[in-house]
Amino acid sequence: MANILIVDDSSTMRKIISRSLRQAGLPVDEIYEAGDGIEGLAVIASGKSIQLILSDINMPNMDGLEFVKAVRANGNSTPIVMITTEGGEEIIKEAMSNGASDSIKKPFTPDQLQEKLGSII
């Protein structure tokens, strides 16, 4: 069973992602939530065992690109999948070069989540 951290400034989107993860039939145990990159780093620093991080790109305080850099700068190798409405290849390339493992575009279905995340967790 996997513990997952969802980092997104929209509480509604965090709930949708959480529900979709469970509907996809993925082996999910705990789901932790953070409203931006700073909160996400705090969850990680708390010592919780996390096997997957899902992060939005556009967030206040610390966006997803900065968040990925900070996670990797701390030596954390947990897979990070960017969840975004951004369609531009450049922003996805930047996220990947910062250390993101993959990306998925909103909106998505539970089946799409299963396909994208099934091999990771």
Residue spans for each PLM region:
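Two-component/phosphorelay signaling modules centered on CheY-like receiver
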Residues: S11-Y32
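Short amphipathic alpha-helix used as the core "switch/output" element in two-component signaling
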Residues: A42, L65-N76
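A Lys-centered signature of the CheY-like receiver
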Residues: D9, K106
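Helix N-cap/capping motif at the beta->alpha junctions
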Residues: E33-A42, G64
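C-terminal output helix
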Residues: F108-L117
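Receiver (REC) domain active-site loop signature in two-component systems and cognate sites
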Residues: M59
